[in-house]
Amino acid sequence: VEKVIPGSAAEKAGLQKGDRIVKVGSQEIDVWHTFTSFVSNNPNVPLELSVDRAGHIISLSMTPEVRQQSGGRKVGFAGVELRIVPLADEYKIVQQYGPFSAMYQAGDKTWQLMRLTVSMIGKLIVGDVKINNLSGPISIAKGAGVSADSGLVYYLMFLALISVNLGIINLIPLPVLDGGHLLFLFIEKIKGGPVSERVQDFSYRIGAMILVLLMGLALFNDFSRF
């Protein structure tokens, strides 16, 4: 366990950072997915946990919170984050590419990140992803620190992810963003004349208000997490 969310079912059960969950009931936990499946499939059902804490096995009882997904299905939620344990060198495989193959791989990865970003924006709009998942500069700084600790390659990948995200967001047709300017140019092309200054000024004001609200919400989410 890397982190226990305050007020969560895990905290109420007594789980702490550094604990290792070894059993749920009589089922041994050899991979994290086994634990998350138990939790997800047993909302509001008491689970008996065997936990390794500093070499001592202790028993805890945890009742997963009930969370309702967008489709109406109810799932359990514990409120813990997994600690990523680095692989030993003998389990690592290093794959290297030539210049042209590397360019292709970079382009393919960028395209995947673009699709993922567009998909997440769409889910935020329709409500499939909760707005409290929106992150701001504090979360970005934390992510940068974690990726930097993992190595240069991970740090550069994180920077690429942020760059792609900002690029896609900048193309949203919202006044004050580049996407808004493109929208005005598109309208101008259709109507054969520029959008009136009054309409543009009003649109910029609305766009700026929306941006400020989103930035404020992202900062609020950041502060509520830390």
Curated annotation (Swiss-Prot):
Keywords: Cell inner membrane, Cell membrane, Hydrolase, Membrane, Metalloprotease, Protease, Transmembrane, Transmembrane helix, Zinc
Transmembrane residue ranges: 152-174, 202-221
Gene Ontology molecular function: any one: metalloendopeptidase activity
PROSITE patterns per the UniProt record, alphabetical: PDZ
Cofactor names: Zn(2+)
GO CC terms in record: plasma membrane
EC number: 3.4.24.-
InterPro entries: PDZ, PDZ_6, PDZ_sf, Pept_M50_Zn, Peptidase_M50
Family of the protein in this entry: Belongs to the peptidase M50B family.
Note: Regulated intramembrane proteolysis (RIP) occurs when an extracytoplasmic signal triggers a concerted proteolytic cascade to transmit information and elicit cellular responses. A membrane-spanning regulatory substrate protein is first cut extracytoplasmically (site-1 protease, S1P), then within the membrane itself (site-2 protease, S2P, this enzyme), while cytoplasmic proteases finish degrading the regulatory protein, liberating the effector protein.
Self-association and partners: Interacts with RseA.
Protein name per UniProt: Protease RseP
Organism listed in the record: Photorhabdus luminescens (Xenorhabdus luminescens)
